[in-house]
Amino acid sequence: MQPQPLKVMVAVGARPNYMKAAPLIRALTGPSTAVETGRPPIELTVTHTGQHYEDGLSRTQFEELSLPAADVNLNVGSGPHGRQTGLILQRFEPVLEEQWPDVLVVAGDVNSTLACALVAAKSWRRLPGGGWKRPRIAHIEAGLRSFDPTMPEETNRRLTDALSDDLLIHSPEARGNLL
């Protein structure tokens, strides 16, 4: 019997996030060793919020990083923090509900990072045998801190870390910030 695929969704919103998520996306879309290891196959969905979006630049960025084109584009565009975050919340929720991944991966500290993590953290489904489940949330670049409360990104980082189940750190300093 074939194991159920592990459904992974990677949500990106800005150019720096593509670079942070690129190694993971390439690993998940590369040759599978699921048969040899006994691990389930992976079903990947890449969602681009369009937070910082220029068609030619985004396409070039995906190509330069050897990434597949995004499966979903929310086309949010630039704008004030509240408007942009609100649009991402509104547009990402139905995508998450339809795709229903086992794991949502977010990267960095932009409004997309926080908004997508918040949607997943609030999305629960009742299990057939009882109990509840939501997608696990993994945060790439967890623990990064500027210690500048006037930076919107600092708020996004701290809140995303608090919402996440898996904190993917990049340095000993980041680990220390999470302890």
What are these regions (language model features)?
Residues 2-48:
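N-terminal phosphate-binding or glycine-rich loops at protein starts, especially the Walker A/P-loop
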Residues 7, 102-103:
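Structural motif
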Residues 17-21, 110-117, 175:
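Short glycine/serine/threonine-rich phosphate/pyrophosphate-binding segments
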Residues 38-84, 91:
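Conserved nucleotide-sugar phosphate-binding/catalytic loop shared by glycosyltransferases and other
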Residues 89-100:
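Short, well-structured alpha-helical segments in soluble
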Residues 105-127:
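An aromatic- and histidine-rich active-site surface loop
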Residues 124-179:
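Active-site-proximal region of nucleotide-activated glycan assembly enzymes
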